[in-house]
Amino acid sequence: MARILLNDVRKSYAGNQVIHGITMEIADGEFVVIVGPSGCGKSTLLRMVAGLEAISAGTVEIGGKVVNDLEPRQRDIAMVFQNYALYPHMSVRENMAYGLKIAKLPKTEIEARVAKAATMLELEPYLDRKPRALSGGQRQRVAMGRALVREPAALLLDEPLSNLDAKLRVQMRLQIKEMHLRTGQTTLYVTHDQVEAMTLADRLIVMNKGVAEQIATPLEVYERPASEFVAGFIGSPAMNIFTVDAADGRVTLPGGAVLPLPVPRGGDLRLGLRPEHLRTAQPGEAAIPVVLRSVERLGADAFGYGMIEGSEVPMVLRLPGTSQLSRGDRVEAVPDPAHLHFFDPVSGRRIEG
């Protein structure tokens, strides 16, 4: 296990910069998830740490040693990819042991490491099976076991669950979390799935167009998003974000309604409200008028999708699962003043109150 340090890491292709100066420290034993939409640079950043992509500027340190010029095999890391890449003619045991045999470790050491990883990943019943006799989730566990038996300084995972169905992803998330708790392995994990990111990470790197928009704990990212991009990306349904005109402790909403709110400054602002931080207004209470277009019922909860009255600005509300509201109904929603998010309309950065 080891600390990973990124110091102003940059990547360019033909003069076009795709990774823009990322600096962070991943502590020994920490589980950090890089999350963002397709094309944001998350896999490129992981591959730079692994040595599969050259670093254009800045440095990467693993275990206190700058590794910019080292080959992947010299960095003491192990990787797990989206595709399992198991040898089809080898058993689970042989797949997990193969790298150790190439490294010429003693047979007893190889057997001990494979047995330890198989126990941790609940693979003992499958050690003599070929990959074709395994489910997708079992194959992915074999790929992880093959990485773990090497006992690397750091474990890097690139979208390891994206080929699995929804039920298997939930199961594998739990197993990955339990595996990390047992091993204390320094882990860098890439995903586009915010649920994976929020449930697995000690800290998140939220990326957008090669920029680390925010590096923080999942709770901090959710409760205090550093930018409008982060606010809209993390959370499901996404945060409602729209432009308001602020002045003298009130905001004028799209459609013309006026709402008293504590504002950080006057002028145009971008206001963010999560669906769960809106409640139905009491009679005579100033509120956001919303006309529903549809209601999505999920059992315990329901979500109402509509528009702010008098505008084309979309709005999502969380409703009780027993709600009888339907298309065309008008709802007056009041935001929780403790959960207001304001963003600069030009830079998109968070404005503190």
UniProtKB/Swiss-Prot annotation:
Task: Tell me the classification of the organism that encodes this protein.
Answer: Bacteria, Pseudomonadati, Pseudomonadota, Alphaproteobacteria, Rhodobacterales
Q: What is the source species?
A: Paracoccus denitrificans (strain Pd 1222)
* Reactions catalysed, as given in the entry: sn-glycerol 3-phosphate(out) + ATP + H2O = sn-glycerol 3-phosphate(in) + ADP + phosphate + H(+)
NCBIfam families assigned to the protein according to its UniProt record, in alphabetical order: PRK11650.1
- The EC code for this enzyme is 7.6.2.10
Please give the name of this protein: sn-glycerol-3-phosphate import ATP-binding protein UgpC
Q: Tell me, how does this one assemble?
A: The complex is composed of two ATP-binding proteins (UgpC), two transmembrane proteins (UgpA and UgpE) and a solute-binding protein (UgpB).
Sorted alphabetically, the Gene Ontology BP terms of this entry are: carbohydrate transport
Gene that encodes it: ugpC
Q: Summarize the protein's role.
A: Part of the ABC transporter complex UgpBAEC involved in sn-glycerol-3-phosphate (G3P) import. Responsible for energy coupling to the transport system.
